[in-house]
Design a protein with these regions (language model features):
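Aromatic "clamp/platform" in nucleotide-sugar-dependent glycosyltransferases that forms part
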Residues: 250
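A short, well-ordered alpha-helix in the C-terminal region of glycosyltransferases
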Residues: 316, 330, 336-337, 344-358
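Conserved donor-binding/catalytic core segment of Leloir-type glycosyltransferases
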Residues: 156-172, 178-181, 194
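Carbohydrate-associated surface elements
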Residues: 109, 130
């Protein structure tokens, strides 16, 4: 078997890039003949099709990337195998997806979303994303490198640090977390909340809205937003610096930070919905709040990015659920429990580590992807 991997390559410290790069590492370590390529680099991809002659091209992304991940390799006779996340609904490419022998999805929620919007369930196999469990390991708060991070963030030894990571914090549930933390601030005031976000125009606007909310709640002085790039090598230390990973995402097809935090022995506070409920075990590796609100849309504007020749408005026969908001009372209860019961947190942290070791080792993921391709893609095993 010879595989070409199409993803955000060269690797960047971002979710889809990490997903692809860990698959590449796992396949290589398993002895599979494979090479990575940038999903948007048409010239390089065509050159690799002709010179490398892969038996299949595994593409990492969402359905909007289908021109790069599926249509392009197929034009050159290469069997495409997309490994897809979701963004709430599938607006196009149903025929192209249904013509494939194998579609990998990152969670059952992603599969359900695609099936609701016209993709055959028989085509899809759930394959969670892998985690580098040798890099993401538990470290004590007394570790010099962990203490250095907490000191740089201004977190005292007796304060609990909550961490959220995302392109923007609001999509990862930061506003729900702020409301929850404000509810319990008088009962347990010794906490700090740090959000790691990407510096971009959209994020800047969203940050201002988040800060306004924090100001109105009287907790702005306890909120820190980090911008700029952090390397993959640094992230295990940042996770270990926190006491709770707070990720009640509004939309989440998997939840890579949730898994990485658990690998570091950090309990997760999130929401019982979407891909998250498949990565976090409520009461065992973290706390999952109920859904406070289901967000539905009845129409959506689509255009070139979604494969249409021009902008148009698509109206649905019935509303589609595309996101959630976590119940803030539940989040407050979970946060208070995790911040005040160190013994339970210790047990959850140990269980979280075992959970990731059993279910999300990137090497096991790579072997399963290899087996699925050999089983489902005609000619891949012998190529």
């Amino acid at each position: 078997m010879r595989l070409l991997l199409l993803y955000d390559y060269p690797p960047q410290p971002a979710g889809l890039s990490t997903q692809g790069d860990l698959l590449f590492r796992g396949l290589t370590e398993a002895g599979v003949d494979c090479l990575p390529a940038p999903r948007t680099g048409d010239l390089q991809k065509e050159w690799m099709y002709k010179c490398y002659k892969p038996s299949a091209a595994v593409g990492i992304g969402w359905w909007g990337y289908l021109p790069e991940l599926v249509l392009h390799p197929r034009r050159f006779g290469i069997a495409p195998v997309p490994w897809l996340v979701a963004d709430g609904w599938v607006a196009n490419y149903q025929d192209e997806l249904n013509s494939l022998p194998l579609i990998l999805t990152t969670s059952s929620w992603v599969s359900e979303t695609y099936a609701r919007d016209g993709i055959s369930h028989d085509k899809m196999v759930v394959q969670p994303i892998g985690c580098d469990i040798e890099s993401f390991v538990p470290l004590p708060k007394s570790h010099p490198k962990i203490r250095a991070i907490r000191e740089s963030l201004g977190v005292a030894d007796d304060e609990k640090l909550l961490l959220t990571i995302g392109g923007d914090a609001a999509s990862k549930g930061s506003q729900e977390m702020m409301i929850a933390l404000a509810k319990i601030d008088s009962e347990f005031p010794k906490w700090r909340y740090v959000c790691k976000v990407w510096k971009q125009e959209r994020t800047e606007r969203q940050n201002e809205l988040d800060f306004s909310l924090a100001e109105s709640l009287g907790i702005r002085h306890k909120i820190t937003y980090l911008e700029g790039v952090l390397s993959r090598e640094f992230m295990p230390y940042l996770y270990n610096a926190c006491d709770i990973y707070a990720g009640p995402s509004r939309q989440e097809g998997f939840g890579m930070p949730h898994v990485e935090a658990q690998a570091c022995g950090i309990p997760v506070l999130s929401v019982d919905a979407m891909g998250i409920k498949e990565t976090v075990v409520h009461g065992e590796t973290g706390f999952l709040a109920g859904v406070g609100e289901w967000i539905s849309i009845g129409e959506c504007e689509v255009g070139v990015e979604e494969g249409y020749p021009e902008r148009r408005l698509v109206k649905f026969p019935e509303p589609k659920v595309v996101a959630v908001r976590a119940n803030t009372d539940d989040l407050a209860e979970g946060a208070l429990q995790l911040m005040t019961d160190d013994k339970s947190v210790g047990r959850m942290g140990s269980a979280a580590r075992r959970h990731v070791e059993r279910n999300f080792d990137y090497r096991d993921v790579a072997k399963r992807v290899m087996d699925l391709i050999a089983e489902r893609v005609p000619g891949a095993r012998s190529a």
